[in-house]
């Protein structure tokens, strides 16, 4: 599938280049158009609504912000909930509350090629701001034989 994504990306860049020559856009319009193409391709990395363990509500079409919740019994797997790829930088604040009856659930955040996993504090809370710089950036919930509830919100940090 990586070869297919690369072929689609290259075709999109060629088509965009041809359109841009005819349109004579500003530099910002070129960046915005390229960012849109990169973002659309990156959506394949986000778990589809129908495949989610939990339930996600995005704010409009923005895949970086919204809310997510799940109530689980012995669940295993991973939900890639928020994020995408972009040439633009974003500062995202994630708030996660995990109430565990058994098993484990954690927040995993990918920023570019760096992947880190975060556990809750003694109150079951994770609250952290991330710099989502250009590239692929995703917030995920990882379930390991988890019984309990998860709530997460993602918003732009000030």
Regions found by a protein language model. Give the residues of each.
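Extracellular and analogous surface-interaction loops
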Residues: 74, 81-92, 129-134
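A short beta-strand element within beta-rich, extracytoplasmic domains
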Residues: 90-100
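Edge beta-strands of jelly-roll/beta-sandwich modules across compartments, strongly enriched
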Residues: 143-158
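Short, surface-exposed beta-strand/strand-loop-strand elements in extracellular ectodomains
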Residues: 101-118
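Hydrophobic membrane-insertion alpha-helices, especially the h-region
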Residues: 6-20
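Short, solvent-exposed loop/turn segments in extracellular or other extracytoplasmic domains
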Residues: 77, 120-127
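Transition segment at domain starts
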Residues: 25-84
């Amino acid at each position: 599938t990586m070869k297919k994504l690369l072929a689609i990306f290259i075709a999109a860049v060629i088509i965009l280049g041809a359109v841009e020559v005819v349109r004579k856009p500003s530099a910002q319009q070129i960046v915005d158009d390229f960012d849109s193409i990169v973002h659309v391709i990156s959506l394949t990395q986000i778990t589809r609504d129908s495949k989610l363990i939990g339930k996600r509500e995005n704010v409009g079409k923005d895949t970086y912000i919204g809310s997510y919740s799940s109530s689980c019994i012995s669940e295993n797997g991973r939900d890639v909930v928020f994020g995408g790829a972009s040439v633009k930088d974003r500062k995202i604040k994630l708030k996660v509350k995990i109430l565990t009856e058994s098993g484990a659930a954690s927040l995993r955040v990918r920023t570019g090629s760096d992947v880190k996993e975060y556990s809750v504090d003694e109150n079951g809370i994770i609250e952290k701001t991330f710099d989502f710089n250009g590239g692929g950036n995703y917030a995920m919930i990882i379930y390991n034989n988890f019984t309990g509830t998860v709530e997460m919100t993602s918003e732009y940090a000030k």
